[in-house]
């Protein structure tokens, strides 16, 4: 998961570079990238749109999840209560988003299994 700001874009790209080094050594490591999930998303800002376009122009573009976790104060409230937002506020936007992301990632896992 990553927020969509300039530092996160750089950091995610650097992390992927390190992971890809391991991916090129299949005899020693079995590692794959399942996806890049965007969190704390606010689609209404020019900054978000600019950074999303920048991310789409990176090597990570193929891994970007369709589901995004929307910005919400409910996430902080649940964290302060030490309870996952999906349990604390199951009908909130973040809960809906996290459940959709889970379904998307499970579908990717199944697709990978079928492709093997």
What are these regions (language model features)?
Residues 100-112:
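C-terminal alpha-helix
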Residues 78-97:
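C-terminal boundary of histidine-terminating zinc-finger modules
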Residues 46-48:
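Beta-rich strand-turn-strand
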Residues 9-34:
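Anionic-ligand binding region
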Residues 20-29, 57-59, 109-114:
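Alpha-helix termini
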Residues 34, 40-44, 53-84:
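Beta-strand-loop-alpha "switch" segments that mediate conformational coupling across diverse proteins
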Residues 1-6:
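Inter-motif core of Ras-like GTPase G domains
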